[in-house]
Amino acid sequence: PIERIDQKLKAIEQTIRSYTNNNFQNRKIRSAGVVSSSKLNVINKLYGLSIGDTVQITESMFNDGLYTVKGIEENTIVLDKELIDEGHILITKVEYPDDVIECCINLCEWEVKNRGKVGIKAETLSRHSVTYFDQDASNQMNGYPVSLLGCLKPYRKARC
């Protein structure tokens, strides 16, 4: 089902953000705002923000997180999830470089093809034998082979 795919993509996105310690925010497309009637009213119009873009809300008591833009009318932004009314938030556009998106696609493909084989070291059927890559703590991160996460190395930021 589509909900399962959406959930898996969100989990992979969170894995990438956690692994790199990078929130991929475009701070040039940012504004303070308020939430009223589940709509986000920004102080400054966000030029460069479009329907379908990912945004991150921070400095919020109730609404911190990642959202998808569903609608924009002047200084009002409609997001994909209900928001709780509050007097101050900060909204910033999130932009992932193409090679990070490619890495996400590779993780999705690995998930589909190999997740069920994790923990199986070898299989033998009649005279046919297959040995799988052994995944242990030294060569995996967040459940994925380190080799798949190598493309994220340029985006890793030091933790404070």
Residue ranges and their predicted role:
Residues 1-102, 115, 138-160:
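Conserved short "hinge" loops at termini or chain/domain junctions
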Residues 108:
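Short Cys/His-centered divalent metal-binding micro-motifs
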Residues 113-121:
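Short acidic, Pro/Gly- and aromatic-enriched capping/linker segments at domain boundaries
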Residues 127:
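Conserved, mostly hydrophobic/aromatic
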